[in-house]
Every structure is written in C-alpha cells, then in structure tokens.
Curated annotation (Swiss-Prot):
HAMAP family: HemL_aminotrans_3. The modification N6-(pyridoxal phosphate)lysine is found at K268. This is Glutamate-1-semialdehyde 2,1-aminomutase 2. GO terms for biological process: protoporphyrinogen IX biosynthetic process. It is found in: Cytoplasm. The gene is hemL2. Its cofactor is pyridoxal 5'-phosphate. SUPFAM superfamilies: PLP-dependent transferases. NCBIfam families: hemL, PRK00062.1, PRK12389.1. It comes from Staphylococcus aureus (strain NCTC 8325 / PS 47). It comes from the Bacteria. InterPro entries: 4pyrrol_synth_GluAld_NH2Trfase, Aminotrans_3, Aminotrans_3_PPA_site, PyrdxlP-dep_Trfase, PyrdxlP-dep_Trfase_major, PyrdxlP-dep_Trfase_small. Its EC number is 5.4.3.8.
Length: 429
C-alpha cells in the first residue's frame, strides 16, 4: 500500500501537534515506529485513509464504535440534535430519557451522573468513595488502565504491603502513596493488601473483565471474593466498565457475571462515538455528590444534548434482537480461523476471546495476568501489525490492546482478515 500522503501529513502534524498525535496510543512507537496512517472517513466496518486505501477496521477507536462508523440511525440523531442546539447549560429531557435507559439496562445504577470521559468518570468515583468512607487509600490491579488522572497513574510496589510509585512524570509521590497495586486474578495478594492496610482502604477499583491488557476474564470466584473481602472491611467496590458496558451484552459485565459493585464508571460505547462518561451506583453513596452532598463534581459539557441524543440512538440499535449473537458468532469464526493459522505456520501465539472482542498474544501460555502480556513478544506483534496494515487490516498498534468487532462486520470481512493473517504469519518464520 502507498502511504505517502499519510507520511506527508504526519510530518506537518509534528510541526503543530505535540508528538504529531493527540493521544500517545495513536503513535506507532509500540510497533517499531513509522508514521501513523491518517484516516479520512469511516463507514460501517471500514476506514479510508488520505491515500485512498481501504481498511477493515478492528481498532474501532479503541472500543466505542460497536455499531460501526457513521451508523445511519446514530448519524441522523446527531444531525437532528445539532440543528436544535448542542449545549444549553441547563437540564434537558434527553438526560432523563438516557438515564432511564441506562438504569433499565444496568440496575445497580440507582442514581447516575454524566461527565465527558472515562477518565473523569473513574476519577469522580474515587472521590465519591473517599467522601463516603472517610478514607483515602485505594487498591487497583496491575495492568488495568483507568484513565490518565494522577489518582490512577501509579505503578505497583514490590508487594501488596508496599505503596505504589508514580507511573508518569508529574504525578506526585504523595498521590502515589495513596494507591496500592496488586495482580489481577490473585485473590491472596488482594487479601494481603486488605489485611495490611485495613481501615485505610476507601475502595478497590476493578475491571470486571479486563480490557486493557487484552481481553482477560476473572478466574472463577475472584470477583465474588473481592466483593466479600472488601465489604467485610468497609471498603467500596468500584467497577470500571468504560470498556465493558454494552460490549458483551445489552447491559454491563457485572450483570453478565452476576457480581454487583457499589459504584460503576462507564463511557466509550454509550456515547455512540461522541465524548461521554458517567458514573452511578447505590443511592446512599451517590448522595455524597453535590448538590446533595459534600463531594464536588461539575462540568460545562456534562450531559450535553448532543451526546445524550447519540447515546439514546446507540442503545436503540443495541437493544434490537440478534445484535450480540452476531458479534459472538463473528468473533468465534475469527478466533477459530486464527488458531488454525497459528497451528499451520507454527507460530507461538494464543488468543483470548470474549464474545465479539479478542486479543492475539505472541506467547505460549494462556493469558490470565498482566505480567504474561508484558513479557509476550512485542517485536513479533509489531511485525504482524505492519504486515496486516499493508493488506488493509487496521488493528490497534499495541500488543496490549483488543480487536473489536462491530454490528457492521460481515463473514466476508472475516475471510479477508484470515487471508491477510495467513500471509502475515507466513512472513514471520
């Protein structure tokens, strides 16, 4: 494929935009470098770049675009609302309608607040939990990404009794000292942290199904034990469902798994492609938030009519019969095809799939923990990524990310993807 115009525009972008991208994950640093492809438009399962190349898209903006690009029902809703006004700074009926649809789908959201990103949503749930418990420390799990606020950019200490350290320049040590990081799926490490820190722990922050070091399921009983141990300690359980809400079924992962948290943060999919975030949970906890309580959270753009309208339209598409069955079927076809090719070409790789989302790891073991992904073969992934890109298959440029299917992918797309993977694997020996 010819990428000359993308390369030219990336050079121009470097003159004006820091690093040439507005989010570091969009660079190709993690796959060996090179100029990122500059996209021009998207329709359904496909993206088109500035050089006229067409791609089957499995990046899907890192997850939000579950109904494909420019879905006609959502596009129409956005256009209609834009003609009426995009921001009023007042309550609207759309906020009420959208909140009701969300609570109908996710019953634990007894009360809801909208913000503008997943980062904001998680950041605020932590503040609310601290206000409710009158404690300061939180526990998070290694490898889970919860946005870029100071509160969660914290790396693990040497063990559950050790405080975290900043995972980014600019994060104060004083903030990191309020965070304990333990391995996901390691209930003994979690018990040890709770036993050591006791009544200092306000909340534990959990991805119920991990989506930030690929797709990883909790081990049987893990979430149930986290809930029990936490509540016995007076610690709140916060689920970060920014990736997982409406990803696997019409609702949240918590309902699919049958384990209910105290608070939930959501975003990505629910905005229909527009900026959105939100949080909600038990009424008595949510009443800590202003104007009813002392925990302050506000936002000029929060609950804006454009995002509310897009979110309503998105849920109207997803609540139709057969949507998630199709995603699961396509995901199964893709997984089975890739596994056959891995065996055919004797590639050291494994796959985790959860319905219409999967991750291909270049490692020889089933992935259940972050360390396994960190030690997987990043060089092999980078080579595979570029071989696929040059055949018109757009993946996330990182070994830690998932492939996302949409309602608009087809069986023919899967066949083309597997044909491309067959060639890519053949070049990796």
């Amino acid at each position: 494929m010819n990428f000359s115009e993308s390369e030219r525009l990336q050079q121009l972008s470097n003159e004006y935009i820091l690093g040439g991208v507005n989010s570091p994950s969009r660079s190709y640093k993690a796959v060996g470098g090179g100029a990122p492809v500059v996209m021009k438009e998207g329709h359904g399962a496909y993206l088109y770049d500035v050089d006229g190349n067409k791609f089957i898209d499995y990046l899907q903006a890192y997850g939000p675009i579950i109904t494909g690009h420019a879905h006609p029902h959502i596009t129409k809703a956005i256009q209609e609302q834009a003609a009426k006004g995009v921001l009023f700074g007042t309550p609207t009926e759309l906020e009420i309608e959208f909140s009701k649809k969300l609570r109908d789908a996710i019953p634990s959201l007894e009360k809801i607040r909208f913000v503008n990103s997943g980062t904001e949503a998680v950041m605020t749930t932590i503040r609310v939990a601290r206000a409710y418990t009158k404690r300061n420390k939180i526990i998070k799990f290694a490898g889970s990404y919860h946005g870029h606020s100071d509160l969660v950019l914290v790396a693990a200490g040497s063990g559950p009794s050790q405080l975290g350290s900043p995972d980014s320049a600019g994060v104060p040590e004083s903030v990191a000292r309020e965070v304990i990081t333990v391995p996901f799926n390691d209930i003994n490490a979690y018990k040890e942290a709770i036993e050591f820190w006791g009544d200092e722990i306000a909340a534990v922050l959990v991805e119920p199904i991990v989506g930030n070091f690929g797709m990883v399921m909790p081990q049987p009983g893990f979430l149930e034990e986290v809930n029990e141990i936490s509540h016995n300690n007076g610690t709140l359980v916060i689920y970060d469902e920014v990736i997982t809400a409406f990803r696997f079924h019409y609702g949240a992962a918590q309902d699919l798994l049958g384990v209910i948290p105290d608070l939930t943060a959501f975003g990505k999919i629910v905005g229909g492609g527009l900026p959105i975030g939100g949080y909600g949970g038990r009424q008595d906890i949510m009443e800590q938030v202003a104007p009813l309580g002392p925990a302050y959270q506000a936002g000029t753009m929060a609950g804006n009519p454009l995002s509310m309208k897009a979110g309503i339209a998105l849920l109207e598409v997803l609540e139709q019969d057969g949507v998630y069955e199709k995603l699961d079927s396509l995901g199964q076809q893709l997984e089975e095809g890739l596994l056959k090719l891995i065996e055919k070409h004797n590639i050291t790789a494994t796959i985790n799939r959860i319905y219409g989302s999967l991750t291909l790891y270049f490692t020889d073991e089933k992935v259940t923990h972050y360390d396994q992904v960190e030690h997987s073969d990043g060089e092999a992934f980078g080579k595979f990524f570029k071989l696929m890109l040059n055949q018109g298959i757009n993946l996330a440029p990182s070994k830690f990310e998932a492939w996302f299917l949409t309602t608009e992918h087809t069986e023919e797309d899967i066949k083309q993807t597997l044909k491309a993977a067959d060639y890519a694997f053949s070049q990796m020996k």
